[in-house]
Amino acid sequence: DDVIKQALAGMIKILYIAPERQENEEWIKATREMKLSMIVIDEAHTISTWGHDFRPAFRRIIDLVKLLPVSFPILATTATATNRVQEDIQSQIGGKISTIRGSLIRSNLMLKVIKVSSEDEKKLWLAANLNKIDGTGLIYTGTRVDTESYSNWLTHVGINAVGYNAGLDSDTRKYIENGLMNNTWKCVVSTNALGMGIDKPDIRFIIHTQIPASPIHYYQEIGRAGRDGKPSTIILFYNDKLDSKGIPTDYSLPKSFIDNARPSIKLYERAVEKLKSEPLSERAIMKATNLKQTQVRVIKSDLIDQNIIKEVKYGSTKEYEYQFGAPKLDTEKFEALRVAKLKDLDSMVNYVYTEMPRMKYLCNFLDCNENTNFDNCDNTNLKKESLEVPQELNNKLQDFHLNYFPLLNTAIATSKTVQGTKWKILITQPNVLEVRKDDILYKSCTMDNYTSVF
């Protein structure tokens, strides 16, 4: 309330807000009364359905933009937009738009790919080589469980490391973030929960143990290294060993996240049936359908976009009302987006196998086609990495496997030993299950799409 009063009184020059604030009726009313001189949309790719990090709440910004005169100054910035995303942003903002594109080339990033056949080979390489890299940096993993596994392994071999993920309490996250800025650890092992808003100029290395979902994700995450312009090491591990379904091991996890990004169609239908009876608030939808808040928010955003429901106000209460005569749910849009994301994932896999300069490959994907002499990767001037490690480290890894037990705050749904193989099912995130075979990730899926492995 105090901030709104100060803004209305003209006492604030620059006001930073989260897009979710645009869902607050008091805030919407206040912005209409403020003497605004400019709107800046940071991370503008998030307002595009085709953007790599689309967030429905960002669409609320467009609702505000539409209330303003066509000539009102708006600046939208992003470091990761393809031509398709750029065109989508332009069409949503509307009006006369000028586009300024800077170079995306990061010549100080030394790009390498290491192909492995197991998680153990990743761990062994890190143990043997991490201390040879100057400075401090980040190691990105695909799951919360792996942040703990890798950080504990590195600690086990005498490397100063700490694990970070969104499941930690806010005080612990803040402590680790401050430690990162002050070079307290050789490396912070994290999911992609760490990075947004981190502006540390001297991150000397970024290593991915799991392939990201697209070259755009990868470019954004490695772009946190070497912002001081000095050389920084960038490494991507890729396990191309085929699983029981003939799919490369490291392809399975990001593919499962893409396949399960949206709730199942039956959950959309469940929500629509409840809303046909009466208008419901978000919390009431959750209660009536027994769905989680994240699921309900995705569902209601899609239903609003397709004009199946609309938002209505009853005093200060916001509810969602079914529009009788509404069109049927168009699942083809969901499938088109899923196919597009799988295509992006395939492009990320192609990055592993490409023979062209790796930075050129990433820039081409982002529609930045510059003729530059690229010489900063293992396809050009840099030596390819070896997987050879001292036997002593193999012994330490065996000892680690015998004595390491995950302490991460995960609920064990079930565990079972079948013909000598240990199977364990963990709830690692809201609505996400991990199936682990002898403590190695076997598959990941949502609870809605889980079928027994036994």
Q: Locations of the language-model features?
A:
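Structural motif
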Residues: P19, T428-Q429, F454
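Buried hydrophobic side chains on well-structured beta-strands
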Residues: L109, I139, V435-R436, L441-T446, ...
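Short loop/turn hinge sites at secondary-structure boundaries
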Residues: G10, N183, D367-C368, D448
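Short glycine-rich phosphate-binding loop at a beta-alpha junction
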Residues: P73, V453-F454
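Short, conserved glycine- and acidic-residue-centered signature motifs
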Residues: F54-A57, S264, K341, D439, ...
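Helicase motor core with emphasis on the C-terminal RecA-like subdomain
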Residues: D1-R270, R283, I309-E319
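A short, well-structured juxtamembrane/interface segment
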Residues: K122-K123, T414-S415, K443-V453
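C-terminal accessory region of SF2 helicases/translocases
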Residues: I207, I211-Q220, G226-P430, R436-K437
